Amino acid sequence: MQNQLVQPIDHSAHTRVHCDPEWVDLQQQLGFTVLLGTRSMGDLHVVSAPNPGSLNFHVVKFPLCMGMAVQGNHLAVACKTDIRLYYDLIAHPQISSPVYQRSYSPRSIHFTGDLDAHELDFDQHGQPLFVAARYSCVASISPVHSFAPLWQPKFISKLTPEDCCHLNGLCMSNGELKYVSMFAATAQPEGWRNLPFNSGQVWSAADQEAVCTGLVQPHSPRLHNGELYILNSGAGEIGRIDLVSGRYECIAFVGGYGRGLSFVGDYAIFGISKPRHESYVPNFPLHDRLKSLNLPDRCQLLAVNLKTGNVIQAITFEGAAREFFDTVVIPDCRHGVIMALDEAQHPQFVTYEQDDCLLPA
């Protein structure tokens, strides 16, 4: 099926998007919205399907857009030096909108400093947990400090800003930290850079042991329908991990560096990015395979059928956009929006418990 030009979304940055009609139909039928964060540009794309045959793109600017998570009516976004918390105003019974099913307004910003925050999720108490890659730990926000460390791999004896193992991904289960992903199990400063590409591992947080090794720069461990999935990013693959044997099984080669795994129905949703290095990196599995297949670098949102391995090149970004980090699927939301800080700071934008107001279209 031929790709269909949807619309230009940022003329100043010369970025265009193309969308596969199969994806438009899927998003329309299942009635969900996707949040897609572009690390390289700091854009958060709210992709909705309010009308048949086309998509709507709402773009919010961030100073680097990293991990994101939705829990109930709450949204959290990790940025370069802060964690931003939002609330869906339409969840208030007194507030309605003729256009949107979700309207997230910023409610607080926690300043962290540059922790190189990566993936993020909520715990059972509704508090955001995030990977502080620079400090090789999983952390939460603190009322008095930049962050509150909650978990670190057993080989990290002291928290220092040295990005030893490039801890990057986390998986929650029933509100508790279950699994993490890292590039290598090392306590040396930026030690992962000096080890083989296939030194990547997924660890059990509770057991402090690896459940799978031999991965290539893995990201986004996720439990879905009782199975553990992983993006084997440096190999350009999505796969599942057998929790008994620890064996990794490739589901599909996706032709790009994947990050930000979400699910809807039988599909895995994530972004693939173009390489940061303009030149070929010798012996890097993804680069070797792209070169052997004569495939171009791509910046796309993908949907992979977990039953068949079929890959839908859902949305292709051309031009300035090069790198995605995270995705979030918002179910039962045909049209969503996120308010920018300047919108929320408008002096006449006031809500309170007894307020009965109508959001502008």
Regions found by a protein language model. Give the residues of each.
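Short loop/turn segments that connect beta-strands within beta-propeller blades
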Residues: 49-51, 89-91, 142-145, 204-207, ...
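Blade-level signature of beta-propeller repeat domains, shared across WD40, Kelch, NHL, RCC1
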Residues: 297-302, 306-361
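Blade-loop segments of beta-propeller domains
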Residues: 53-121
